[in-house]
């Protein structure tokens, strides 16, 4: 996207200009991935110019408008500092989920390592699937589980396996445990298969998740 194209989207509806106008989160991420530091500066300019909001706006009709300022901040941090620039935001509970969203779209070994580092300190005992730890594990699942995923060394795959094993143990819900099983698809193959096959599962959802994970791991042999 060109600079003037983003500026035009920010200057028109349908959303109020303080909520980004017609700018979508995906626009900001693509823009900063394409334009780097210069793109980050432009995002910061638009955020200041239109006073992009920090908080959700909830309307009487039950709809809501998402805040654009946090996305602008994390995109700008990445544009100026790369993956390392997002580290302070990962450490900020108010910004972590936004930083995780950008890291997922960066799709690099460095972004995988940043997510693993975040998860290493995370508590997976929360039941909320939108919590930062769950979002980070879901991002790793997206980045590492499929044919066109990020290629990482075996040591990283082993770190992922240790992570999903801990997430499995801590998760209080079937949904959380199933996510851990799905994420094992990107782990070191032989060890992940042995672990999955050792689990005594009864819930239909988790049995199905294990089946999917084992199928993918066999494809990677």
What are these regions (language model features)?
Residues 1-23:
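N-terminal leader/linker segments that initiate helical-solenoid repeat arrays
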Residues 154-163, 198-202:
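Alpha-helical scaffold repeats of the Armadillo/HEAT/TPR superfamily
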Residues 47-53, 115-122, 157-168:
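Amphipathic alpha-helical segments within extended alpha-helical solenoids and repeat-rich scaffolds
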Residues 15-37, 45, 56-78, 84-88, ...:
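Structural detector for internal amphipathic alpha-helices that build alpha-solenoid repeat scaffolds
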Residues 6-10, 51-53, 80-85, 160-164:
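Repeat-mediated protein-protein interaction surfaces in helical alpha-solenoids
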């Amino acid at each position: 996207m060109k600079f003037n194209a983003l500026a035009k989207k920010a200057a028109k509806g349908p959303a109020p200009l303080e909520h980004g106008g017609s700018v979508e989160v995906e626009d900001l991420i693509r823009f900063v991935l394409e334009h780097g530091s210069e793109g980050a500066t432009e995002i910061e300019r638009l955020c200041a110019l239109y006073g992009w909001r920090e908080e959700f706006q909830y309307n009487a009709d039950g709809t809501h408008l998402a805040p654009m300022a946090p996305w602008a901040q994390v995109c700008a941090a990445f544009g100026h500092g790369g993956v390392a620039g997002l580290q302070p935001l990962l450490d900020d509970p108010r910004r972590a989920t936004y930083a995780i969203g950008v890291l997922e779209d960066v799709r690099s070994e460095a972004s995988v390592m940043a997510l693993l580092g975040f998860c290493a300190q995370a508590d997976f005992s929360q039941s909320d699937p939108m919590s930062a730890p769950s979002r980070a594990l879901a991002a790793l699942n997206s980045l590492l589980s499929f044919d066109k995923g990020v290629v990482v060394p075996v040591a990283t795959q082993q770190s992922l396996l240790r992570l999903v094993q801990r997430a499995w143990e801590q998760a209080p819900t079937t949904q959380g445990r199933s996510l851990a099983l799905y994420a094992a698809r990107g782990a070191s193959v032989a060890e992940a298969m042995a672990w999955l096959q050792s689990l005594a599962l009864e819930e239909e959802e988790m049995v199905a998740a294990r089946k999917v994970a084992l199928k993918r791991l066999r494809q990677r042999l």
